């Protein structure tokens, strides 16, 4: 069959390969027309079909006693007990945010919210994981300003609190920022709304906003590297309306309660093409779509434009016959569009009509189920660049002493730095520093269920308030905790260890607030998998995620894969991002009265380190290291070394012990040791509680910078009331008796009323800093770099 278009040019435009075209022709038993080729282009993109990553994802654990819905639906669902379930998912909007930071981020929030309420859940919380280049670059300042404003605008207007997240900075993200949005929704019904169509002849109803030309080919755009040309591709960025989405949420939840909707699918990536093909394929049926009935906001739209538009705030339903009129009236009352646009077919195809003619007909499973898989060879050895970094040893660093470190003459800090100066420089690192400038723009109290606000604890906590209006806030004692984590520098240096650390830290953060970790949603942000290094990073990170999720009993319920996160520079060089597998994890708080924050609460409280203890010998513990640490990068300008091993058995033991200790009332505060190690964690607890601390480090032959700033897993700082000292020691002894050989506690010091942080060893002062100086560095690091008024930014 001859075609009326330039095949080679069309394939380039759609991001398809010649082999893909041959396969399409084989499946159709003919050549596709231009509309059909566009449908295949978006549906066979990595963004929609995971053609490079699907075999790797199959290794993830996806089942568990609390899992109600796993991968494959709009969102995962876990059973919370007491008749409540939680829907949750994370998605990326990276490439659109690089082009139009405000709209890219805003529509990312809108899209993840639709994934949640499409399941029949009411959205109760948002989180985000963001990555940018250094703030010394004005373009990066513009990106973070636009992204944060977009997230705040959409979330605040739609009435869903943004309760937590993380922000990190690295030069690898300068041309390709990462914007990952996570949402949680509460369900109080056994009726989960799924997306598979059923009921031959049942009407297909379109609801929400009109269809325009915005977001054309967004899925294909998201599956390619960013270039100078693509940065001018503004039509690939959608435009959102949070007020319309608010009405869509309420109308959809009303419709789902009626029982008249038998299947639902939001229109996200690939728009109508994806919605129709996924609903048809999952239901084992077909869908006929009449474009003349689709509400349009622009005249003269072609079938290609209708099918590939990614206009926001749109949904597709399969509805029980006879109920379509009442359902559409409900949406119209909310000021939304509603129209019958097709029907369910027995033949397993997506058939598209315009002006009474068939403009496209494609087998549904060819678009949404039986899609291509690109196989890549996994190299047996790490790339040479990484092998060289793994050879680095701590003894290559300059000599340290009680007063600090003797730097070489090439250091931009001068020849010497005291431990005080080093701690202040770490607190001034934007990745470590306070993110108050970011989260103060978010409404985190809307819905009045936020128990633990951003910056207060290691994870966000939201009250599980009944959605039916039964019971006051005071009567609700259960909550859900959520967190997003990824140590991207570790993943860059060792993808498997870094991914394990991401899962372990997420679970650790949940445990620090007293929550039982339940399940994971992941967002795999990686460069191109078509290079040996790129695929090695992706494959080993997936291996690490799988291993950690199995060990910590946190199944994966779904997520998102975002590849080709790299920028082609003006000289033609490719700049890939650091591989960033963001782990979103949710946990159950059985009693909100026991929620734990990171702030010191009372002078005199005892400070203990749980988990891997501080070294007392020169021998290097592989579980704690300066390799890949914030200290190494910030002070020495090095991103090198092999990150520490995570002892998953100890991780489970320590986290379980911590949760039990919080429940029993022993632990007043808890904070995990992460970026910057012990010294930074203690400083953060002091700043949060406006109280000082005196720590006496054990005598040790190990380097002092290792004792103060080394990083690793299974390390949690807790404070315990002095009145509980004897009982606490008894509990510790019982735990160690139950786990012979486990050493996971170390007394370090005491919380003080003095507004200073004092760290000593054998009576020698290492660190002595007033709280106001710690706080100033911590709070002003980001605003200062952005040139903001510091007096109004803290």
From Swiss-Prot:
Q: Where does Mg(2+) 1 bind?
A: 91, 560
Which Pfam families does this one have?
Answer: AIRS, AIRS_C, FGAR-AT_linker
Q: Which GO terms describe its cellular component?
A: cytoplasm
**Does the record bear Nucleus in its keywords?**
no
Where this protein primarily resides, as one coarse class?
Answer: cytoplasm
Q: Where does substrate bind?
A: 92-95, 114, 238, 310-312, 562
Q: Does the keyword Cytoplasm apply?
A: yes
Q: Which residues form the active site?
A: 47, 93
Lineage top rank: taxon: Bacteria
Q: Which InterPro entries match?
A: PRibForGlyAmidine_synth_PurL, PurL_linker, PurM-like_C_dom, PurM-like_C_sf, PurM-like_N, PurM-like_N_sf
Task: Tell me the route in metabolism or biology where this protein functions.
Answer: Purine metabolism; IMP biosynthesis via de novo pathway; 5-amino-1-(5-phospho-D-ribosyl)imidazole from N(2)-formyl-N(1)-(5-phospho-D-ribosyl)glycinamide: step 1/2
Which keywords are on file for this protein? ATP-binding, Cytoplasm, Ligase, Magnesium, Metal-binding, Nucleotide-binding, Purine biosynthesis
Top-level EC class = ligase
Q: Which GO terms describe its biological process?
A: 'de novo' IMP biosynthetic process
**Any idea of its EC number?**
6.3.5.3
GO-annotated molecular function: ATP binding; magnesium ion binding; phosphoribosylformylglycinamidine synthase activity
| Gene3D superfamilies, sorted | PurM-like C-terminal domain, PurM-like, N-terminal domain
Positions bound to Mg(2+) 2: 115, 266
Q: Which reaction does it catalyse?
A: N(2)-formyl-N(1)-(5-phospho-beta-D-ribosyl)glycinamide + L-glutamine + ATP + H2O = 2-formamido-N(1)-(5-O-phospho-beta-D-ribosyl)acetamidine + L-glutamate + ADP + phosphate + H(+)
Summarize where ATP binds, as residue positions: 50, 89, 522, 559
Protein family per UniProt: Belongs to the FGAMS family.
Q: What does this protein do?
A: Part of the phosphoribosylformylglycinamidine synthase complex involved in the purines biosynthetic pathway. Catalyzes the ATP-dependent conversion of formylglycinamide ribonucleotide (FGAR) and glutamine to yield formylglycinamidine ribonucleotide (FGAM) and glutamate. The FGAM synthase complex is composed of three subunits. PurQ produces an ammonia molecule by converting glutamine to glutamate. PurL transfers the ammonia molecule to FGAR to form FGAM in an ATP-dependent manner.
Oligomeric form and interacting partners: Monomer. Part of the FGAM synthase complex composed of 1 PurL, 1 PurQ and 2 PurS subunits.
- Can you say what this protein is called? Phosphoribosylformylglycinamidine synthase subunit PurL
Tell me the lineage of the source organism. Bacteria, Bacillati, Cyanobacteriota, Cyanophyceae, Synechococcales
Q: Gene name on record?
A: purL
